[in-house]
Amino acid sequence: MTSHLKKVELHCHLEGAAPPALTEAQARKYGIDMSEQLRDGAYVWHDFASFLECYDKVSEVYKTEEDYALLTETYLDELAAINTIYSELIVSPDHGKRIGLGADAYISGVCEGIRRAKEKSGIEARLIVTGERHFGPDSVIGAAEYAAKAGNPLITGFNLAGEERMGRVADYSRAFDIARDAGLGLTIHAGEVCGAFSVADALDAVRPARIGHGVRAIEDLDLVKRLADLGTVLEVCPGSNIALRVYPDFASHPLRRLKEAGVPVTISSDDPPFFHTSLEREYALAAEAFGFDNAEIDAMTRTAIEAAFVDAQTRKALLARL
């Protein structure tokens, strides 16, 4: 049983965490037909293309600053209820612009949701601003500049997400230079859709502290050793990897092999309701599917706190809560 364990999440996309019940209420509020994407309280998709369509449709029902405050508060409340003490949320200021809300109002709403949730439960949260590969290097540089100039204490990291097959990591290295110079923590999606080479590219071009997913590194044992030697932390999302058919089943998933090879690994949920999972389920899977005992799971949570993009005082306080 892992329900009593303290939990930490480093890899979760905010819009991808939208609870179906809240999305349904939002759709009614705005008169948006979600019948193709939401049935019997669950999101519906059948392949990667329809997953993206469903994700975009869900995002349509969150339009205002208050909508984003409510979304953030609701998800963090869910996390707090399962003993989560810290969450990093991946957010896109570009998304705020695209929906006509604006980056500042979008981020302001999310920050208000964080404030409300913390007031109730004490849960800590930070924001990881992401650029999206499929919009090209200039867009990603813009996201990095936004994060660097925001002066927002809750924005503590920078990420690159989106279609992994769009260009090489080096095409986006300028954005990471901007974020690094601003003192932001660096993480990057790699080694999910694409193979081990994408993880090697990320290490060469970005030198990130963490990698989102990174599990395909297992296909190159020299790369696995490099990750272990560098201490690069992987934000592993097993339920997501199975749902998107990166691996056919948990028996073939490399989480345990990576950990046993000395790679620092952590557990996250990615886009939980879309993959019919949750952080609670991911922790349970660590025990049930991968055979980790509670001490090993606690060690992964400690790794997550040590790798969190927070100041020393917050890190010390989080470690004290384990």
From Swiss-Prot:
InterPro entries, sorted: A_deaminase_dom, ADE, Ado/ade_deaminase, Metal_Hydrolase
Catalytic activity: adenine + H2O + H(+) = hypoxanthine + NH4(+)
GO biological process: adenine catabolic process; hypoxanthine salvage; nucleotide metabolic process
UniProt key word Zinc: yes
Catalytic residues, chain numbering: 192 (proton donor)
The record's free-text note on cofactor binding: Binds 1 zinc ion per subunit.
Positions with a binding annotation for substrate: 271
GO molecular function: adenine deaminase activity; zinc ion binding
Tree of life domain: Bacteria
Cofactor field: Zn(2+)
One Pfam family of this chain: A_deaminase
Site feature location: Important for catalytic activity: 213
UniProt-listed Enzyme Commission number(s): 3.5.4.2
Entry keywords, A to Z: Hydrolase, Metal-binding, Nucleotide metabolism, Zinc
Residues that, per the record, bind Zn(2+): 11, 13, 189, 270
Family the UniProt entry places it in: Belongs to the metallo-dependent hydrolases superfamily. Adenosine and AMP deaminases family. Adenine deaminase type 2 subfamily.
Functional summary from the UniProt entry: Catalyzes the hydrolytic deamination of adenine to hypoxanthine. Plays an important role in the purine salvage pathway and in nitrogen catabolism.
PANTHER family, per database record: ADENINE DEAMINASE
HAMAP family: Adenine_deaminase
Name of the protein in its database record: Adenine deaminase
Organism name: Rhizobium etli (strain CIAT 652)
